[in-house]
Regions:
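Short, charge-patterned binding micro-sites
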Residues: 59-65
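A charged helix-plus-loop insertion that forms the helical arch/lid used to bind
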Residues: 69-82
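Short secondary-structure capping/junction motifs at helix and strand boundaries
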Residues: 95-104, 122-135, 147-149, 163-165, ...
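Structured secondary-structure scaffolds
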Residues: 2-57, 109-113, 158, 164-236
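A glycine-rich helix N-cap at a beta->alpha junction
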Residues: 84-100
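Cys/His-rich short segments
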Residues: 124-178, 182
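Basic, alpha-helical terminal appendages of large translation-related enzymes
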Residues: 1-14, 54, 58, 74, ...
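Conserved short loop/turn motifs at secondary-structure junctions
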Residues: 102-110, 140-141
Length: 236
């Protein structure tokens, strides 16, 4: 008998679930466990139902906010990330959360995958350079438009003043995929669940997709821009 036919996992339905990659700017708290508890419960059910399950969780360790926090503490960003990441791992152990893969954005594997992906997408013509001007909230690590802001140019989330930002970055050409996405969702109406989330995405596309920056020259703590481009900065 063929050995492959004796492999029970070959005939099991596959189920993959990923949690957010948790930001390690500060220590985790009880709220940090909410999503992983729900994810763990779903995966346990799927295993009982006979599925071959893979649950991924992990941490997002890059960005200007983490770099600043580490500097304020007088340690390196990597040392800060190592310390806080360990606390997340300890939290999952305390709640008996079982996961299959743990991803760290500071790992060598992650860096290589991102660089490879960047090079492939750029080779297809979907990445280009342009100047970006905008209003940036360091706490959110995100750009804001003026209609989002509170009086005095304050971030609506953190109530801190946003910074004017201008630099030449790499952009992903998201706008060129509008028609393909519209057609994809027509052909696969059940791809996004629940339905109201699909309607949100469709409205977002109908309003016009915009290309967005994927690099920051002013940030050093992140996946470096590929050396072949002979530039400094980090990918977002």
């Amino acid at each position: 008998m063929n050995s492959q036919s004796n492999n029970p996992s070959k005939h099991k339905p596959k189920f993959f679930l990923t949690t957010p990659l948790y930001y390690v700017n500060a220590e985790p708290h009880i709220g940090s466990a909410y999503t992983n508890i729900a994810a763990d419960a779903i995966c346990r059910f799927q295993r009982l139902a006979g599925s071959e399950v893979c649950m991924l969780t992990g941490v997002d360790e890059h960005g200007g906010k983490i770099e600043k926090t580490a500097t304020d503490r007088g340690i390196t960003p990597q040392a800060h990330c190592d310390e806080i990441t360990e606390k997340f791992v300890e939290l999952w152990e305390k709640f008996n959360i079982k996961y299959d893969k743990f991803s760290r954005t500071s790992s060598e594997k992650h860096n290589k995958v991102v660089e490879h992906f960047f090079e492939r997408v750029k080779a297809k013509g979907d990445i280009y350079q342009a100047e970006y001007k905008g209003l940036y909230c360091l706490a959110c690590e995100d750009f804001k438009n003026e209609r989002e802001l509170l009086g005095g140019g304050l971030c609506p989330v953190h109530h801190t003043k946003v910074q004017e930002y201008s630099e030449t970055n790499y952009f992903f050409a998201l706008s060129k995929y509008s028609d393909k996405l519209i057609q994809f969702f027509k052909d696969h109406p059940d791809f996004i669940q629940p339905k109201y989330r699909l309607h949100e995405i469709q409205t977002w596309i109908d309003e016009g997709l915009k290309d967005f920056p994927i690099s920051r020259r002013s940030v050093n703590w992140g996946v470096g821009i590929p050396k072949s481009l002979e530039e400094t900065g980090a990918l977002q």
